[in-house]
């Protein structure tokens, strides 16, 4: 381009450096940089908007199952937006029960397992996300039962419509820890003998323990309902996160996006 400009100046016998506005590579690169930045911002905004649309669709289509929600009625459910877990509490004169489900996304694992399909029909005719079904069978729930004689701690996993122990431990009253926001840490960091590894516990004992938990209200329906709430909370938090990113890169569009989402 510079060579062409010099040639043109010579042909018309006007010195290049006497032109009113000198040619500047800086100006060219600056305009190109602005143009490129605008394209990248637009591409990012489109991808975010597409992801936002998918998350909103899944949330709209996936409604809590009434049959499962009834299983939560005897518990007090805590869903503090600032905390990265959901807990269910029940207290009687003899014991305290706390079930905690962490909040995290299983999208990556789900995508690696099978392609995402937006919805599927469940047995009650309600719409439910395949991702939610995967989530229910991949995330553990941490159960803590405490009375005057000690604390039973266990992690439960749903598999093929049944509850299975991922870990089981017992702590005597003098070693029992106070109700913790993260029961995983209690299970993982205990330095005292709390029991054998789950795979070495006889199947008959594990079966009886599951029946005992069932009497306390910790059933398959209870677990599915609580984990579903965890899944929904993560997706709602993710939706707000996308809103924040869109508002950051497109400040003028953030108010419009929030209005459309609230409608």
From Swiss-Prot:
Protein name: Uncharacterized protein C15D4.11c
Alphabetic keyword roster: Mitochondrion
Domain of life: Eukaryota
Organism: Schizosaccharomyces pombe (strain 972 / ATCC 24843) (Fission yeast)
One protein family per Pfam: MAM33
Keyword Lipoprotein: no
Subcellular location per the Swiss-Prot or TrEMBL entry: Mitochondrion
Entry's Gene Ontology cellular component terms: mitochondrial matrix; mitochondrion
GO biological process per UniProt: cytosolic ribosome assembly; mitochondrial RNA processing
Predominant cellular place of this UniProt entry's protein: mitochondrion
């Amino acid at each position: 381009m510079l060579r062409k400009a010099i040639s043109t100046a010579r042909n018309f016998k006007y010195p290049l450096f006497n032109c009113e506005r000198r040619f500047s590579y800086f100006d060219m690169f600056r305009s190109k940089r602005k143009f490129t930045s605008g394209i990248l911002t637009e591409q990012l905004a489109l991808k975010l908007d597409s992801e936002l649309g998918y998350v909103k669709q899944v949330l709209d289509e996936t409604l809590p199952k009434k049959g499962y929600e009834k299983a939560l009625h005897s518990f007090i459910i805590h869903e503090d937006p600032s905390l990265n877990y959901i807990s269910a509490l029940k207290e009687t004169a003899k014991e305290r029960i706390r079930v905690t489900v962490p909040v995290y996304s299983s999208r990556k694992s789900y995508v690696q397992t099978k392609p995402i399909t937006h919805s599927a029909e469940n047995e009650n005719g309600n719409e439910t996300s395949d991702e939610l079904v995967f989530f229910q069978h991949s995330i553990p729930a941490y159960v803590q039962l405490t009375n005057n004689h000690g604390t039973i701690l266990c992690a439960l996993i749903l598999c093929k419509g049944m509850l299975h122990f991922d870990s089981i431990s017992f702590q005597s009253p003098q070693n029992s820890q106070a109700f913790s926001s993260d029961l995983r840490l209690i299970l993982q960091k205990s330095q005292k003998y709390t029991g054998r590894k789950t795979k070495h516990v006889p199947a008959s004992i594990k079966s009886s323990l599951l029946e005992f938990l069932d009497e306390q209200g910790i059933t398959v329906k209870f677990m599915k309902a609580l984990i579903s709430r965890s899944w929904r909370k993560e997706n709602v938090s993710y939706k707000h996160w996308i809103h924040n990113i869109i508002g950051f890169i497109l400040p003028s569009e953030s108010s419009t996006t929030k209005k459309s989402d609230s409608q």
